């Protein structure tokens, strides 16, 4: 069992039950999944860029990502329906906890001038979205092997009903929020 999951079961659940006054252990919010998405805009001119993004994401997440395709054609962006425009991966269970542990304790502190993540990035339903400007903050990425600096979106989906509950959950799990 991963370190973060153990922490969730032993420390976070009792703390949240006390803080929000839940009567049943099943009411306590938990992290459902983590979705990581890399938009590869240059994939239409350079198909190799997509492969590089797939490799990066595979190393970061520990599982093979799925290629996302354009839903409709947009002339201004010069894309047609069905063209590959990004890669995403959905983590659940142990892999999700391992990734979050790595994100909170290793990757985020390596961001330049890091003061904490914004406490305003909740969506109103208890999910948290986070943008990262470069993939280099992850320890698996070798600086010499990357072709281009890519950003990514990380969405943490929780079962919390409100943003306040979700923030309490993520704070107790070790998410470094800005004060």
UniProtKB/Swiss-Prot annotation:
GO molecular function: rRNA binding; structural constituent of ribosome; tRNA binding
Pfam (any one): Ribosomal_L5_C
Gene Ontology CC annotations of this record: ribonucleoprotein complex; ribosome
Keywords recorded for this protein, A-Z: Ribonucleoprotein, Ribosomal protein, RNA-binding, rRNA-binding, tRNA-binding
InterPro entries: Ribosomal_uL5, Ribosomal_uL5_bac-type, Ribosomal_uL5_C, Ribosomal_uL5_CS, Ribosomal_uL5_dom_sf, Ribosomal_uL5_N
Keyword Ribonucleoprotein on entry: yes
GO BP annotations, alphabetical order: translation
Protein family according to the UniProt entry: Belongs to the universal ribosomal protein uL5 family.
Function: This is one of the proteins that bind and probably mediate the attachment of the 5S RNA into the large ribosomal subunit, where it forms part of the central protuberance. In the 70S ribosome it contacts protein S13 of the 30S subunit (bridge B1b), connecting the 2 subunits; this bridge is implicated in subunit movement. Contacts the P site tRNA; the 5S rRNA and some of its associated proteins might help stabilize positioning of ribosome-bound tRNAs.
Quaternary organization: Part of the 50S ribosomal subunit; part of the 5S rRNA/L5/L18/L25 subcomplex. Contacts the 5S rRNA and the P site tRNA. Forms a bridge to the 30S subunit in the 70S ribosome.
Protein name per UniProt: Large ribosomal subunit protein uL5
């Amino acid at each position: 069992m991963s370190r973060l999951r153990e922490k969730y079961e032993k420390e976070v659940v009792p703390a949240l039950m006390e803080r929000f006054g839940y009567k049943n252990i099943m009411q306590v919010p938990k992290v459902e999944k983590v979705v990581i998405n890399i938009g590869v805009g240059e994939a239409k001119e350079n198909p190799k860029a997509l492969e590089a993004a797939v490799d990066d994401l595979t190393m970061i997440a520990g599982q093979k990502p799925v290629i996302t395709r354009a839903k409709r054609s947009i002339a201004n962006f010069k894309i047609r329906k069905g063209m590959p425009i990004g890669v995403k991966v959905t983590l659940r269970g142990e892999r999700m906890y391992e990734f979050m542990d790595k994100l909170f304790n290793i990757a985020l502190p390596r961001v330049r001038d890091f003061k904490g993540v914004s406490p305003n990035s909740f969506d109103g339903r208890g999910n948290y979205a986070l943008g990262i400007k470069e993939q280099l903050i992850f320890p698996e990425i070798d600086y010499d092997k990357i072709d281009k600096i890519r950003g990514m979106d990380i969405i943490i989906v929780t079962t919390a009903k409100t943003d306040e509950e979700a923030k309490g959950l993520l704070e107790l799990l070790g998410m470094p929020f800005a004060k």
